[in-house]
Amino acid sequence: MVSMEESSVFDYIRENRRTIVLSFLAVAVVIFLIGFFAGFGDILRALEGTSPYFLALNFVLEAIILILWTLRWRLILNVVDDAPSFPRLMMLLFTSIFGNNITPGAAGGEPLRAYLLREVEGTPFEIGFASSTADRVFEFIPFALISILSAVLIMTWEISIWTRIVVSVLILVTIAGFSLAVYAGMNKKIAQRIALSVTRRLVSWFSRFREGGISFAGIHEKVIFYINRFNDGFSTAITDRRVFVIGFFISLGMWALDVCRLYVCFLAVGVSPPAVPLIIIYTVGILISLLPILPGSLGLREGILVGLFAVAGIGADYVMAASVVDRIASYIAPTLIGLIAAIYYGKQMTS
């Protein structure tokens, strides 16, 4: 059995290229269906009137968000290890965004960050993974506040009681799930128990396909060692008061800018959405992006936005046009930059 630390994440992407290709084919079908019902002609007409000023502002806001993201990760890395220079760290972040955006449920980004830190900077894998995981925790804290606000605001929205209940429950369940994950990450005994349980099952499963089987006793101590290193790094980053306060406000600023950016995307196509529905729908869109179904939740998020903004009185053609403006800056551009960075690091490590 080969661990993520010992194998290339690029190899993982290569080995799973069929699944990735099929996922993007599914994305194409979903987007085609949404576009068909919204009206391709109407969407194109909405896009033809796109304001270049707001389009440029969309890219500026996304660039600021990415800079803040790099600053937050660097802040955490400097607590658990020595962080590389800002430009190098930002390129590593772009590479991880590429991994996130081509794998369903954004499953490839955090291991890819840890892997590249080890290969390029010599940072131990478990420390790099702890830093990228802690980085996601800081992202979750303001999201939890926005989600609670959305759960309250949705009660004032003129929609069916069942829609209010479903969205509110979805928000609260997500908050509870993340809270449990953070608690498990900071509690060494629970983290060890979960890791050993998962490892034992994996060893049992792989033993069926390997002659002579695999000894669990042989990797037990190694699992404990890595979990302890991960737990120490994760806890250090989360419990450092200075890092926590600065990281929290950076994350809050990132979320505020992202909500503003979505608003700007609608302004770009000539629509001004009401503030309360925008915050609620933005939160639901983030929740949908967590589902490990399609890469980048392409199509799924658009479908949800079309349905929810219809309640706010905004037509599907304008919602889809705003989504295109949004995806150009938040998905296509970072993914292409990340692809170039991934190719660069791949060649560097090969040579």
From Swiss-Prot:
Its main location: membrane. Keywords: Cell membrane, Membrane, Transmembrane, Transmembrane helix. The keyword Transport does not apply. The chain crosses the membrane at residues 20-40, 51-71, 137-157, 165-185, 244-264, 275-295, 304-324, 328-348. It holds the Pfam family LPG_synthase_TM. GO terms for cellular component: plasma membrane. PANTHER family: UPF0104 MEMBRANE PROTEIN MJ1595 (PTHR39087:SF2). Belongs to the UPF0104 family. NCBIfam families: flippase-like domain. It is found in: Cell membrane. It comes from the Archaea. InterPro entries: L-PG_synthase/AglD (IPR022791). It is a multi-pass membrane protein. This is UPF0104 membrane protein MTH_887. It comes from Methanothermobacter thermautotrophicus (strain ATCC 29096 / DSM 1053 / JCM 10044 / NBRC 100330 / Delta H).
